[in-house]
Swiss-Prot record:
One of its GO terms (biological process) is defense response to Gram-positive bacterium. This is Defensin alpha 4. GO terms for cellular component: azurophil granule; extracellular region; extracellular space; Golgi lumen; specific granule lumen; transport vesicle. Residues 20-63, 97 form a propeptide. It comes from Homo sapiens (Human). The gene is DEFA4.
Length: 97
């Protein structure tokens, strides 16, 4: 599992380096300001079904969550997806006692 976590970290760094600075898109308003490299952030979106949402009770308070490449660990619950650099990862949480 440590190897998978290390490979995931290397993949994320490689994606960030490859992405470079944000480019202005044709669908943006002409007067819209372009963000510099220091203003870039990672967008994480969550999408889960009702059964997962009920298990989490609408919050991840008291839980430790992380984005995994494919599968959650045996002690974790799959809550949704993380979208990092255009790549979808599995969002997994485990309860903290």
């Amino acid at each position: 599992m440590r190897i998978i976590a290390l490979l995931a970290a290397i993949l994320l760094v490689a994606l960030q380096v490859r992405a470079g600075p944000l480019q202005a898109r044709g669908d943006e308003a002409p007067g819209q300001e372009q963000r510099g490299p220091e203003d870039q952030d990672i967008s994480i979106s969550f999408a889960w079904d009702k059964s997962s949402a009920l298990q989490v009770s609408g919050s991840t308070r008291g839980m430790v969550c992380s984005c995994r490449l494919v599968f959650c660990r045996r002690t974790e619950l799959r809550v949704g997806n993380c979208l990092i650099g255009g790549v979808s990862f599995t969002y997994c949480c485990t309860r903290v006692d």
